[in-house]
Amino acid sequence: MKSTPKLLLLLLFIINHHVDSGSIVKFLPGFEGPLPFELETGYIGIGEEEDVQLFYYFIKSERNPKEDPLLLWLSGGPGCSSITGLLFENGPLALKSKVYNGSVPSLVSTTYSWTKTANIIFLDQPIGAGFSYSRIPLIDTPSDTGEVKNIHEFLQKWLSKHPQFSSNPFYASGDSYSGMIVPALVQEISKGNYICCKPPINLQGYILGNPITYFEVDQNYRIPFSHGMALISDELYESIRRDCKGNYFNVDPRNTKCLKLVEEYHKCTDELNEFNILSPDCDTTSPDCFLYPYYLLGYWINDESVRDALHVNKSSIGKWERCTYQNRIPYNKDINNSIPYHMNNSISGYRSLIYSGDHDLVVPFLATQAWIKSLNYSIIHEWRPWMIKDQIAGYTRTYSNKMTFATVKGSGHTAEYKPNETFIMFQRWISGHDL
């Protein structure tokens, strides 16, 4: 009996060490047979006491993990789990769209995984997103700038536990709201490499898809985008331009003419799927909906056998939600314009790929083109189509600051609408080839 406290302490040490160091996942419920790639999951503690525990999924490159680039993938939201990227956009697995029957939903292999040519860390952030959690009540409200520092610390600690990847070329990547986080993170890493942190992270650049960049610009370009896509009439477009004077979403309440015209605009567009105007605005609980796998994800990941397989800490969170901050957790959006970070990163010489699904109404490609133009870098390669098997997959332009802009034809707010095309675009760019 006297040895019981020592055994308990030893057990706690083993559990904490096991969680923090990462665990290999060889099988996943819903997938037949062993996984055809190397998956590791785990937590990295943040802060002096490491009370914040950030959860990650790490997948090794299927080609040459010792030399291939190391990517960090952040999903948007803020507060959406990175498994959104893994299972819906650029990972090696996807949920099979089959009517839910009470059993664990099925997983299938994909042909468009970015892990074919890169090692990828899919990180659940901020605190409370996915399986990331805090052991103690938070004193400060999570924020953009706070998460940038947390993610930087995560990377330093993760690489210290995985030193074999320290020399791999590193790229930060993400989409949607990550457009606020990734550019600031790149700047933070760059500064840290010179000031505080050894060994330095081998930072080479960043990748962003349909990035939220400057709320006012992103929103205001929805009007010209809607006109160009024939969603509103010429007459409404000319009237709204004249009476709103380019400010469509933060309208002076005294400007009644503009308010009425904006109301007419919403009548024409509110029933659309704003994430891809070509896709139906459907109920995700319906098996006929393109996004039905999102509904299945909740059943899959909340199944106890799945959480056990992923080595999720049982005392961490209750029911998993794909996006948390939009619903119930306070968050301080203290970066309202990430353009200055892009400018600083350009000056530092980092490569960047900025891509836009050209049927996204949330962050229209026109808005992204506008802020890129505001950087005032000269054009190296003029606007041209990029091709896949003699077919136009989108259009691209490159700039003197090592920035490549590309559209993905027919795609929407995220890569899931055209995953094969987005993968080929990524594969060419990350290899240093022209699109």
Curated annotation (Swiss-Prot):
SUPFAM superfamilies: alpha/beta-Hydrolases (SSF53474). GO terms for cellular component: extracellular region. Keywords: Carboxypeptidase, Disulfide bond, Glycoprotein, Hydrolase, Protease, Secreted, Signal. Its EC number is 3.4.16.-. Disulfide bonds join C80-C323, C244-C258, C282-C289. It is an enzyme of class 3 (hydrolase). GO terms for biological process: proteolysis. One of its GO terms (molecular function) is serine-type carboxypeptidase activity. It comes from the Eukaryota. Pfam families: Peptidase_S10 (PF00450). It is found in: Secreted. PANTHER family: SERINE CARBOXYPEPTIDASE-LIKE 11-RELATED, SERINE PROTEASE FAMILY S10 SERINE CARBOXYPEPTIDASE. This is Serine carboxypeptidase-like 12. It comes from Arabidopsis thaliana.
